[in-house]
Amino acid sequence: MMLHYETYGDGPPILFLHGFGASSYTWNKVVKALSQTNKLILLDLKGHGQSPKPADKAYSLQAQSELVLAIIREHNLRDLTIVGHSFGGGVALLTALQLQSWAANPLSSLILIDTVAYSQPLPLFVRALRLPIIGRLLPAMLPIEMQVRHILKLAFWDDRKITNDMIAAYSAALRLPGSRKALVETARQMVPSNIEEIAASYPMITTPTLILWGSHDEIVPIEVGKRLHVAIPNSKFIVVEHSGHIPHEEVPESVLPEIRKFLSSSRASQF
């Protein structure tokens, strides 16, 4: 399956994996700065953005990770950084675990932002989408802009930072054919039943890892980030103040310096 992606800049590659219901748009506030030193690959996960949305129901973390691994192989990516947010962070974790078994691990650093990683209570709107009848009807019952505004208000700590451009961009992606059905399937498979079994393998990740977490995340609790930091041996945990679940959109001025500092230090440690 050919997933849609956008590329910017030149240099060591960074592969970006967005969260649930999002697209490559979520990275728009960090692209300009990071593309000055790196080649950025902004992927739309299966069922999201401009990528295919087949009715095959294969929208789990594992299924998404297999597609990401195929892209890494196809493009022969080396000295690679993966950045994953929320659901995309869960995909990044599974991908990092798989790459550990490669003869030559191409992953040089991992950045996880407010990441799905363990069993946890899901937000009400995700639980609703998982229900057999309501999940099918709900996306069609309310105007898309209303749904997007509600979700962004939950995701942002300061909802004054939610702009009309954001709402328009998220809404446009959800209007694409097949998007609503793909969203429902992804919601139903967001946290796999064996997530704690998978989590037991996190200590096997030896790649230098930066874990960023919004101080007021109401979707994936900050305790998840702290637990993840303990589990991954070569990790650094940073709380991003004055932000919710999407700090790279809400306070990019706080996120960017941390990413740049981490990339510089992890590259320096390789020489």
Q: What are these model-predicted stretches?
A:
Residues 1-14, 35-38, 73-78, 260-271:
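Alpha/beta-hydrolase fold catalytic core
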Residues 3, 141-203:
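Conserved alpha/beta-hydrolase catalytic His-Asp/Glu region
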Residues 6-50:
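Conserved HGGG/HGGXW glycine-rich cap/lid loop of the alpha/beta-hydrolase fold
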Residues 6-8, 41, 45-87, 103, ...:
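Active-site loop/oxyanion-hole signature of alpha/beta-hydrolase fold enzymes
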Residues 97, 105-140:
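Flexible "cap/lid" loop of the alpha/beta hydrolase fold
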Residues 205, 211-213:
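Short beta-strand/loop motif that positions the catalytic acidic residue
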Residues 216-220:
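Acidic catalytic loop of the alpha/beta-hydrolase fold
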Residues 235-271:
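Catalytic active-site module of serine/aspartate enzymes centered on a nucleophile-bearing elbow/loop
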